[in-house]
Amino acid sequence: MFYDQARIFVKGGDGGNGIVSFRREKYVPEGGPNGGDGGDGGNVIFIGDEGLRTLVDFRYQRHYKAERGEHGMGKNMHGRNGQDMTVRVPIGTVVKDAETGKILVDITCDGQQYIAARGGRGGRGNAKFVSSTNRVPLIAEKGEPGEEHWLELELKLLADVGLVGFPNVGKSTLIASVSAARPKIANYHFTTLEPNLGVVRIAEGQSFVMADIPGLIEGAHTGAGLGHDFLRHTERTRYLIHVLDISGSEGRDPLEDYDAINRELALYKPELADKPMVIAANKMDLPGAEENLARLREKLGEGAVIFPISAATRQGLEPLIYHVHKGLEELGPVVFERVTADAHMDVRFTGKTEERFKIHRDEQGVFVVTGKEVERHVAMTDMENEESVARLQRIFDVMGVDQALRDAGCQHGDPVRIGDLDFDFIEYAAQYAERDDDGENG
């Protein structure tokens, strides 16, 4: 099995910040808070597209970031939500977490959507923090950071185009010239023992997969050489390019080669003869090529589609590739096998309540608190605002973070880390005792 792979980074947009603002109008001495909320960040969304065949475009762009939400404004004005970023992927793409290798989703149908990175929630403005005990709140939340991940994309490659022909006619050179494939190339028969696959990129969003089918010999349909293995690969292609050594540099007659290969294809499976096929008259840069090309045209007549090329010098390759691409478009999209997602794919809810946070002590002796909820609260708190910090402390008390730190052995003055926040653990009883000692000594 052959796979196209890509590693990309996705990040949802950060939420916009809420703001602290108060109504200020003439004759309204107690206008009250009117700080608006920040907008939500946009999501990064994968969309299945039956028109795409490869992952080649992800080699040119690896980072995908959605737009962040706008900050809130006064007069209770809500910041605009960030725009989603849509990323089109071929049908059959499997998305994995790059760190764990866990399968996140299998894109199995056209139009299927998957949120690869969710945008952060917009922070609340101070108008949302009014209460009976706090009529003039000076608190506003920062926007929640958007999710970010490194992802592995994997796509099972099915060759659109197969190169057929005798050994040493230049198939490997041709596929190396029109794609990023780098097959082993040498001047002897059966250099290629396994199909070499290359992705031919026409333009952004337009590409196809070409397979260098190992060289055939007469009697291949009976299993001679590696005939059955080689011919089996041609069944999976939609379009064939018959590569001829038109110069006859191997001492064979290219016209006889043409008849022999077509005969082997028809004898193995008659329906192979019905596949669309063009002829690539290769090695036009060598002596004798022009004469043999004229003989071939005379033999096959005006209806034959022949492209004189030299894979070694890249002569005539562009017309051949564009003709094949147009032919594939006329054949229409491939009908893909629908894959049933495994139980571990794209699970939204398992019915199991996860721990709200975990605590461990790292090698430097720092108590590290991890958990999506606690890290979100830290990220959305303005650490320059005393009221916001006090509110964060109350949240931690309610969640039981302080008590859990004590249970883990954390003592007054020990270092603690939550997300990007580093601080020293403070036992308020000890803090007050220190203040009393300072007062007595003063």
Curated annotation (Swiss-Prot):
Gene Ontology MF: a single term: GTPase activity
Localisation per UniProt entry: Cytoplasm
Binding site for GTP: 165-172, 190-194, 212-215, 282-285, 310-312
Every OCT domain range: 349-427
Cofactor or coenzyme needed: Mg(2+)
CDD domains the UniProt entry points to: Obg
The enzyme's E.C. designation: 3.6.5.-
UniProt-recorded name of the protein: GTPase Obg
NCBIfam families: Obg_CgtA, Obg_CgtA_exten, PRK12296.1, PRK12297.1, PRK12299.1, small_GTP
Gene3D superfamilies in UniProt: GTP-binding protein OBG, C-terminal domain (3.30.300.350), GTP1/OBG domain (2.70.210.12), P-loop containing nucleotide triphosphate hydrolases (3.40.50.300)
Main subcellular location: cytoplasm
Signal sequence, renumbered to the chain: none
Enzyme class: hydrolase
Function: An essential GTPase which binds GTP, GDP and possibly (p)ppGpp with moderate affinity, with high nucleotide exchange rates and a fairly low GTP hydrolysis rate. Plays a role in control of the cell cycle, stress response, ribosome biogenesis and in those bacteria that undergo differentiation, in morphogenesis control.
Organism name: Heliobacterium modesticaldum (strain ATCC 51547 / Ice1)
Residues of the Obg domain: 1-158
Residues involved in Mg(2+) binding: 172, 192
InterPro entries given in the database record: G_OBG, GTP-bd, GTP-bd_Obg/CgtA, GTP-bd_prot_GTP1/OBG_C_sf, GTP1-OBG_CS, GTP1_OBG_dom, GTP1_OBG_dom_sf, OBG_GTPase
